[in-house]
Amino acid sequence: MKSLNRQTVSMFKKLSVPAAIMMILSTIISGIGTFLHYKEELMPSACANGWIQYDKHCYLDTNIKMSTDNAVYQCRKLRARLPRPDTRHLRVLFSIFYKDYWVSLKKTNNKWLDINNDKDIDISKLTNFKQLNSTTDAEACYIYKSGKLVKTVCKSTQSVLCVKKFYK
């Protein structure tokens, strides 16, 4: 094999620097193009289509009116739940969707339950505790209406909003 002289080696070095720079630039540009083309697969949205993202949660207006039992079932099918009565998002949800909707509060046999999981709720921690505590009905369910929790019959039909955490 024939060895190259100093001038030829020097010329190759001078030509290889711009070529290397061009290769680096084309690799970066190609990477950006690939990312933009596949961004939905590489960085999926926190919430699925139709769900509204707010403060690490996804909210869906089902556009259906139904009883509490059916509302809980509908949200479970979507791997979600009804909004809790103690969440600070209730007012925001009302301003976004502008409708009365079920919350997961139910009074049955003088016990206050979260109907998403049938666990007891300490209503003294809720903002309108005094109003809730004055309820004498044996059974009552609640909707969020114009800034407050309002008692209603559990079998009545109301709007259903479902909530779930990001990426579930």
UniProtKB/Swiss-Prot annotation:
Give the disulfide map: 75-162, 141-154
Plastid found in the keyword field: no
- Where does the sequence pass through the membrane? 15-37
Residue intervals of the C-type lectin domain: 54-163
Q: Does the keyword Transmembrane helix apply?
A: yes
Q: Which UniProt keywords apply?
A: Disulfide bond, Glycoprotein, Host Golgi apparatus, Membrane, Signal-anchor, Transmembrane, Transmembrane helix, Virion
Q: Which Pfam families match?
A: Lectin_C
Signal peptide limits: none
What is the annotated localization of this protein? Virion membrane; Host Golgi apparatus
Q: Intravirion compartment: which residues?
A: 1-14
Q: Know the name of this protein? A: Protein OPG162
Gene name linked to the record: OPG162
